[in-house]
Amino acid sequence: MRRFVSLRAVLISLSLALAPMLAQAKPVWIDVRTEAEHRQNHIDGDPLIPHRNILAQVTERFPDKDTEINLYCRSGNRAGKAKSALESAGYTNVKNRGSVAEAREARNP
């Protein structure tokens, strides 16, 4: 019985320690357009972080620099700028997914 309690305590400790890492393992999709563009057409559930604010908000919300971050905008131009900013800050898994339509297609091939 004592071993069971010890094993259970170890498993609980491990699950608590790994929970933040597992939560970040899910890919993040970010709309980097303006609020007005986002209101007109957006993908439900994806955060809006305009490309000019990308570094401050991503480093706060997604501190793990290995998180898969997928960026999109109207044409891919602003997503490219945001990608460069994040990579310069040390993010290692950032993708420019192009337009909103291309991002939808990439998620549901």
Task: Give residue ranges: language-model regions.
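Bacterial N-terminal signal peptides
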Residues: 2, 9-19
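Rhodanese-like catalytic fold shared by cysteine-dependent sulfurtransferases
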Residues: 2-6, 25-28, 35-68, 77-109
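Non-catalytic, polymerase-adjacent accessory regions of viral genome-replication enzymes
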Residues: 21-23
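Short, surface-exposed ligand- or partner-binding patches at beta-edge/loop junctions that are enriched
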Residues: 72
